[in-house]
Design a protein with these regions (language model features):
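A conserved regulatory-domain signal marking ACT and ACT-like small-molecule sensing domains
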Residues: 2-173
Length: 173
């Protein structure tokens, strides 16, 4: 099935990683500001002073090489790594997902085994993990999974026994 140009948007996915320090986001957006682009999505996480920043932009395809060159210079000046992926996307794929489910997992000691079992159960129920965030670490570790593609009831039924067997608690919202 082909799509018309009206159904597609040219995008650039920017993935920046490196040691976190003040001013990285400001510098990145300063480099992008001369171009006629729109920020479609953005996520940032810092774990143990390591930064991962992803930005999805909508742009004119004619600007791709100039943006890529400016981002390479930015990476050198900031001493970070920047990878890019430019492609056409269906506009419908860029819209915000609805009906997301939030699963909170809390435990005094959260193990890889527990997360492996929960992630497998989530997948087996047809859900996709959209985002994972640590909300707290002391005295309990609390992790939030944001999921798409399943029902609250199904997830509650499948995750509850796993949580109990791993001395954890879950809340599905």
């Amino acid at each position: 099935m082909s799509t018309s140009a009206d159904d597609e948007q040219y995008t650039g996915l920017i993935l920046l990683s490196g040691v976190d320090k003040p001013g990285i986001a400001a510098s990145l957006f300063e480099v992008l500001s001369p171009f006629s682009i729109t920020i479609v999505d953005i996520e940032q996480v810092v774990v143990k002073d390591r930064l991962i920043l992803t930005v999805l932009i909508a742009l004119n395809p004619a600007h791709e090489s100039a943006i890529a060159a400016d981002l390479e210079s930015c990476a050198v000046s900031l001493d970070v790594d920047i990878a890019t992926l430019f492609s056409y996307e269906e506009k419908s794929a860029l819209s915000t997902k609805s009906n997301l489910i939030h699963v909170l997992i809390s435990a005094k000691k959260l193990t890889p085994k527990a997360l492996s079992q929960m992630a497998a159960s989530i997948s087996q129920n047809g859900a996709n993990i959209e985002r994972v965030t640590r909300l707290a670490s002391n005295p309990l570790t609390i992790i939030e999974f944001v999921l798409s593609g399943a029902t609250k009831e199904t997830l509650t039924q499948s995750l509850s026994p796993i949580a109990i067997s791993n001395s954890a608690e879950i809340t599905v919202q």
